[in-house]
Amino acid sequence: MKKIKNRMKYLPSLCFLLLSPLSLKAQSEQPIEVKEAYKYVGETKIVCGRIVSTKYLKRASGGPIFLNFGRDYPNQQMTGLIWFGRFSEYFTYKPEKFLKRKNVCVKGYISEHEGKTQMEIRTEKQIKLRE
């Protein structure tokens, strides 16, 4: 009986160690609002907000599509960047038309380009429409 009691004292620590990774994963899966995205540069997050405008530069190298979140360019809170020339096969719709003025959540790595927060989007699976 004494051996069991001695082993039981380690049970809370063991539970904590086993469940901590689950807790950390759950935290990283918690959506954040687009206005907070700049705080998470260098991390992979789910970011939610309204795409207020889009721009497709068809003739530019890589065919970039810019999704401006929160506010119009050049004051956007975050830019979603789709290199449509490389990743068009991963979309069943035209992102620059379909996503304009939509409220969405996007999952990806948050980076910064020329002082602006951005996220590269490679597939429509990263994008979920929000009610």
Protein language model regions, located:
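OB-fold and OB-like single-stranded nucleic-acid-recognition modules
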Residues: L24-E131
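Bacterial N-terminal signal peptides
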Residues: P12-P21
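Bacterial N-terminal signal peptides that target proteins for export
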Residues: K2-P12
